[in-house]
Amino acid sequence: MEGGGGIPLETLKEESQSRHVLPASFEVNSLQKSNWGFLLTGLVGGTLVAVYAVATPFVTPALRKVCLPFVPATTKQIENVVKMLRCRRGSLVDIGSGDGRIVIAAAKKGFTAVGYELNPWLVWYSRYRAWREGVHGSAKFYISDLWKVTFSQYSNVVIFGVPQMMLQLEKKLERELEDDARVIACRFPFPHWTPDHVTGEGIDTVWAYDASTFRGREKRPCTSMHFQLPIQA
Protein backbone atom coordinates (compact mmCIF):
# COMPACT_ATOMS: atom_id res chain seq x y z
CA MET A 1 0.00 0.00 0.00
CA GLU A 2 1.14 3.56 -0.65
CA GLY A 3 1.61 6.15 2.08
CA GLY A 4 3.58 3.79 4.42
CA GLY A 5 0.68 3.49 6.94
CA GLY A 6 -0.66 0.07 5.94
CA ILE A 7 0.28 -3.52 6.90
CA PRO A 8 1.68 -5.65 4.10
CA LEU A 9 -0.73 -8.30 2.76
CA GLU A 10 1.77 -11.11 3.39
CA THR A 11 1.97 -10.18 7.09
CA LEU A 12 -1.82 -10.28 7.44
CA LYS A 13 -1.94 -13.78 5.89
CA GLU A 14 0.76 -15.08 8.24
CA GLU A 15 -1.03 -13.70 11.30
CA SER A 16 -4.34 -15.20 10.16
CA GLN A 17 -2.77 -18.65 9.69
CA SER A 18 -0.99 -18.48 13.04
CA ARG A 19 -4.30 -18.01 14.85
CA HIS A 20 -5.48 -21.45 13.61
CA VAL A 21 -2.35 -23.39 14.56
CA LEU A 22 -2.60 -24.93 18.06
CA PRO A 23 0.47 -25.38 20.22
CA ALA A 24 2.02 -28.87 20.12
CA SER A 25 1.63 -29.25 23.88
CA PHE A 26 -2.10 -28.66 23.61
CA GLU A 27 -2.47 -31.44 21.02
CA VAL A 28 -0.54 -33.90 23.20
CA ASN A 29 -2.67 -33.09 26.25
CA SER A 30 -5.86 -33.56 24.26
CA LEU A 31 -4.66 -36.94 22.97
CA GLN A 32 -3.74 -38.08 26.48
CA LYS A 33 -7.12 -37.04 27.83
CA SER A 34 -8.84 -38.94 25.02
CA ASN A 35 -6.81 -42.09 25.76
CA TRP A 36 -7.58 -41.85 29.47
CA GLY A 37 -11.25 -41.43 28.64
CA PHE A 38 -11.32 -44.61 26.57
CA LEU A 39 -9.41 -46.48 29.28
CA LEU A 40 -11.76 -45.30 32.03
CA THR A 41 -14.79 -46.23 29.96
CA GLY A 42 -13.36 -49.69 29.36
CA LEU A 43 -12.60 -50.23 33.04
CA VAL A 44 -16.07 -49.13 34.13
CA GLY A 45 -17.71 -51.30 31.48
CA GLY A 46 -15.59 -54.31 32.37
CA THR A 47 -16.35 -53.87 36.06
CA LEU A 48 -20.08 -53.73 35.42
CA VAL A 49 -19.93 -56.88 33.29
CA ALA A 50 -17.94 -58.69 35.99
CA VAL A 51 -20.35 -57.60 38.73
CA TYR A 52 -23.30 -58.72 36.63
CA ALA A 53 -21.71 -62.12 35.94
CA VAL A 54 -20.97 -62.71 39.61
CA ALA A 55 -24.18 -61.30 41.07
CA THR A 56 -26.71 -62.76 38.64
CA PRO A 57 -26.61 -66.33 40.01
CA PHE A 58 -27.21 -64.94 43.51
CA VAL A 59 -29.89 -62.43 42.55
CA THR A 60 -31.84 -64.68 40.18
CA PRO A 61 -33.11 -67.07 42.89
CA ALA A 62 -34.34 -64.10 44.91
CA LEU A 63 -36.48 -63.05 41.96
CA ARG A 64 -38.21 -66.41 41.82
CA LYS A 65 -41.54 -67.09 43.50
CA VAL A 66 -39.92 -69.58 45.90
CA CYS A 67 -36.21 -69.15 46.57
CA LEU A 68 -33.72 -71.41 48.32
CA PRO A 69 -30.98 -69.20 49.80
CA PHE A 70 -27.47 -70.48 50.43
CA VAL A 71 -26.70 -70.85 54.13
CA PRO A 72 -23.76 -73.21 54.83
CA ALA A 73 -24.55 -76.26 56.93
CA THR A 74 -22.94 -76.38 60.36
CA THR A 75 -20.79 -79.29 61.46
CA LYS A 76 -23.53 -80.36 63.88
CA GLN A 77 -26.15 -80.31 61.14
CA ILE A 78 -23.99 -82.54 58.97
CA GLU A 79 -23.49 -84.95 61.87
CA ASN A 80 -27.24 -85.08 62.44
CA VAL A 81 -27.91 -85.77 58.76
CA VAL A 82 -25.40 -88.62 58.84
CA LYS A 83 -27.16 -90.04 61.92
CA MET A 84 -30.35 -90.21 59.89
CA LEU A 85 -28.51 -92.10 57.15
CA ARG A 86 -27.53 -94.98 59.44
CA CYS A 87 -28.85 -98.27 58.15
CA ARG A 88 -29.57 -96.58 54.84
CA ARG A 89 -28.16 -97.48 51.46
CA GLY A 90 -28.60 -96.53 47.83
CA SER A 91 -28.22 -93.14 46.20
CA LEU A 92 -28.55 -89.75 47.88
CA VAL A 93 -29.52 -86.34 46.59
CA ASP A 94 -29.11 -82.97 48.26
CA ILE A 95 -31.68 -80.49 46.96
CA GLY A 96 -30.00 -77.10 46.87
CA SER A 97 -26.54 -78.48 47.65
CA GLY A 98 -24.82 -75.12 48.25
CA ASP A 99 -21.09 -75.63 48.67
CA GLY A 100 -21.41 -79.42 48.62
CA ARG A 101 -20.86 -80.26 52.29
CA ILE A 102 -23.68 -82.78 52.64
CA VAL A 103 -22.95 -84.50 49.33
CA ILE A 104 -19.25 -84.84 50.13
CA ALA A 105 -19.97 -86.13 53.65
CA ALA A 106 -22.36 -88.74 52.25
CA ALA A 107 -19.87 -89.79 49.58
CA LYS A 108 -17.27 -90.36 52.30
CA LYS A 109 -19.73 -92.73 53.97
CA GLY A 110 -20.11 -94.83 50.84
CA PHE A 111 -23.16 -93.27 49.20
CA THR A 112 -23.39 -92.35 45.56
CA ALA A 113 -24.33 -88.73 46.18
CA VAL A 114 -25.65 -86.01 43.88
CA GLY A 115 -26.24 -82.32 44.50
CA TYR A 116 -28.51 -80.00 42.53
CA GLU A 117 -27.79 -76.30 42.84
CA LEU A 118 -28.99 -73.31 40.84
CA ASN A 119 -25.89 -71.19 41.52
CA PRO A 120 -23.11 -72.17 39.06
CA TRP A 121 -20.36 -70.66 41.21
CA LEU A 122 -21.32 -72.94 44.10
CA VAL A 123 -21.50 -75.95 41.79
CA TRP A 124 -18.01 -75.32 40.44
CA TYR A 125 -16.67 -74.85 43.95
CA SER A 126 -18.39 -78.05 45.10
CA ARG A 127 -16.80 -80.00 42.26
CA TYR A 128 -13.38 -78.64 43.19
CA ARG A 129 -13.94 -79.48 46.85
CA ALA A 130 -15.04 -83.04 46.00
CA TRP A 131 -11.87 -83.48 43.95
CA ARG A 132 -9.76 -82.10 46.79
CA GLU A 133 -11.45 -84.46 49.28
CA GLY A 134 -10.90 -87.44 46.99
CA VAL A 135 -14.58 -88.29 46.40
CA HIS A 136 -15.15 -86.73 42.98
CA GLY A 137 -15.99 -90.20 41.61
CA SER A 138 -19.01 -90.65 43.90
CA ALA A 139 -20.00 -87.01 44.50
CA LYS A 140 -21.55 -85.26 41.51
CA PHE A 141 -22.98 -81.76 41.21
CA TYR A 142 -25.32 -80.30 38.62
CA ILE A 143 -26.63 -76.83 37.84
CA SER A 144 -30.40 -77.16 37.88
CA ASP A 145 -33.65 -75.77 39.25
CA LEU A 146 -34.97 -78.26 41.81
CA TRP A 147 -38.50 -77.97 40.42
CA LYS A 148 -37.28 -79.27 37.06
CA VAL A 149 -35.62 -82.40 38.52
CA THR A 150 -37.35 -85.74 39.08
CA PHE A 151 -36.19 -87.43 42.28
CA SER A 152 -37.69 -90.90 41.79
CA GLN A 153 -34.26 -92.50 41.31
CA TYR A 154 -32.98 -91.49 44.77
CA SER A 155 -33.37 -93.50 47.97
CA ASN A 156 -32.32 -90.66 50.28
CA VAL A 157 -33.26 -87.01 49.89
CA VAL A 158 -31.77 -84.16 51.92
CA ILE A 159 -33.24 -80.67 51.91
CA PHE A 160 -32.29 -77.45 53.71
CA GLY A 161 -35.53 -75.70 52.89
CA VAL A 162 -37.46 -72.57 53.74
CA PRO A 163 -41.07 -72.49 55.03
CA GLN A 164 -42.45 -71.01 51.81
CA MET A 165 -41.41 -74.04 49.75
CA MET A 166 -41.99 -76.99 52.08
CA LEU A 167 -45.64 -77.65 51.20
CA GLN A 168 -44.99 -77.60 47.46
CA LEU A 169 -41.90 -79.78 47.86
CA GLU A 170 -43.84 -82.18 50.10
CA LYS A 171 -46.34 -82.79 47.31
CA LYS A 172 -43.60 -83.21 44.71
CA LEU A 173 -41.64 -85.77 46.74
CA GLU A 174 -44.73 -87.72 47.77
CA ARG A 175 -45.62 -88.00 44.11
CA GLU A 176 -42.16 -89.02 42.88
CA LEU A 177 -40.35 -91.08 45.54
CA GLU A 178 -40.41 -94.86 45.95
CA ASP A 179 -41.82 -96.42 49.12
CA ASP A 180 -38.37 -97.24 50.52
CA ALA A 181 -37.10 -93.67 50.22
CA ARG A 182 -36.25 -91.42 53.15
CA VAL A 183 -36.48 -87.63 53.21
CA ILE A 184 -34.25 -85.72 55.63
CA ALA A 185 -35.27 -82.12 56.31
CA CYS A 186 -32.97 -79.61 57.98
CA ARG A 187 -33.89 -76.31 59.70
CA PHE A 188 -37.61 -76.58 58.82
CA PRO A 189 -39.96 -79.62 58.94
CA PHE A 190 -42.55 -80.53 56.36
CA PRO A 191 -46.02 -79.18 57.22
CA HIS A 192 -48.14 -82.35 56.97
CA TRP A 193 -45.81 -85.31 57.38
CA THR A 194 -45.13 -86.87 60.77
CA PRO A 195 -41.39 -87.50 61.20
CA ASP A 196 -40.15 -91.00 61.96
CA HIS A 197 -37.05 -89.66 63.69
CA VAL A 198 -35.94 -86.28 65.07
CA THR A 199 -32.51 -85.31 66.32
CA GLY A 200 -30.75 -82.08 67.28
CA GLU A 201 -31.92 -78.80 68.74
CA GLY A 202 -32.64 -75.33 67.39
CA ILE A 203 -31.22 -74.67 63.94
CA ASP A 204 -29.42 -78.03 64.08
CA THR A 205 -32.68 -79.99 64.27
CA VAL A 206 -33.10 -82.66 61.60
CA TRP A 207 -36.32 -84.53 60.75
CA ALA A 208 -36.40 -87.88 58.94
CA TYR A 209 -39.49 -88.99 57.02
CA ASP A 210 -39.88 -92.45 55.51
CA ALA A 211 -41.98 -92.58 52.36
CA SER A 212 -43.66 -95.76 53.58
CA THR A 213 -44.89 -93.82 56.63
CA PHE A 214 -46.28 -90.72 54.93
CA ARG A 215 -47.99 -93.05 52.45
CA GLY A 216 -49.33 -95.26 55.27
CA ARG A 217 -47.46 -98.37 54.19
CA GLU A 218 -45.33 -100.87 56.08
CA LYS A 219 -41.71 -99.89 56.70
CA ARG A 220 -38.71 -102.10 56.04
CA PRO A 221 -36.72 -103.05 59.17
CA CYS A 222 -33.24 -101.68 59.83
CA THR A 223 -30.69 -104.50 60.00
CA SER A 224 -27.26 -102.84 59.98
CA MET A 225 -25.33 -99.71 60.91
CA HIS A 226 -22.25 -99.42 58.78
CA PHE A 227 -20.54 -96.15 59.65
CA GLN A 228 -19.62 -93.99 62.61
CA LEU A 229 -19.66 -90.40 63.81
CA PRO A 230 -18.30 -87.80 64.09
CA ILE A 231 -17.42 -86.26 60.74
CA GLN A 232 -15.98 -82.93 59.73
CA ALA A 233 -17.47 -80.47 57.26
UniProtKB/Swiss-Prot annotation:
N-acetylmethionine-modified residues are where?
A: M1
Does Glycosyltransferase appear among the keywords?
no
**Tissue-specific expression:** Ubiquitously expressed.
What is the top-level taxon of the source organism?
Eukaryota
**Sequence intervals crossing the membrane:** 38-58
Q: Which organism is it from?
A: Homo sapiens
Compartments annotated for it: namely: Mitochondrion membrane
What EC number(s) are associated with this protein in UniProt?
A: 2.1.1.-
The first-level EC class reads transferase
The molecular function GO annotations come to: protein-lysine N-methyltransferase activity
Stretches the record annotates as Required for mitochondrial location = 56-90
Instruction: Give membrane topology per the record.
Output: Single-pass membrane protein
Q: What does this protein do?
A: Mitochondrial protein-lysine N-methyltransferase that trimethylates ATP synthase subunit C, ATP5MC1 and ATP5MC2. Trimethylation is required for proper incorporation of the C subunit into the ATP synthase complex and mitochondrial respiration. Promotes chronic pain. Involved in persistent inflammatory and neuropathic pain: methyltransferase activity in the mitochondria of sensory neurons promotes chronic pain via a pathway that depends on the production of reactive oxygen species (ROS) and on the engagement of spinal cord microglia.
GO process terms (BP): peptidyl-lysine methylation; peptidyl-lysine trimethylation; positive regulation of proton-transporting ATP synthase activity, rotational mechanism; positive regulation of sensory perception of pain; regulation of mitochondrial ATP synthesis coupled proton transport
Indicate the impact reported for E117A: Abolished protein-lysine N-methyltransferase activity
Its catalytic activity? Answer: L-lysyl-[protein] + 3 S-adenosyl-L-methionine = N(6),N(6),N(6)-trimethyl-L-lysyl-[protein] + 3 S-adenosyl-L-homocysteine + 3 H(+)
Keyword terms: Acetylation, Membrane, Methyltransferase, Mitochondrion, S-adenosyl-L-methionine, Transferase, Transmembrane, Transmembrane helix
Q: Per the record, what about its domains?
A: Contains an atypical, non-cleavable mitochondrial targeting sequence responsible for its localization to mitochondria.
Any one cellular component term from GO for this entry? Answer: mitochondrion
The yes or no answer to whether the keyword Transmembrane is present is: yes
Name it: ATP synthase subunit C lysine N-methyltransferase
> What family does this belong to?
Belongs to the ANT/ATPSC lysine N-methyltransferase family.
Q: Which InterPro entries match?
A: FAM173A/B (IPR026170), SAM-dependent_MTases_sf (IPR029063)
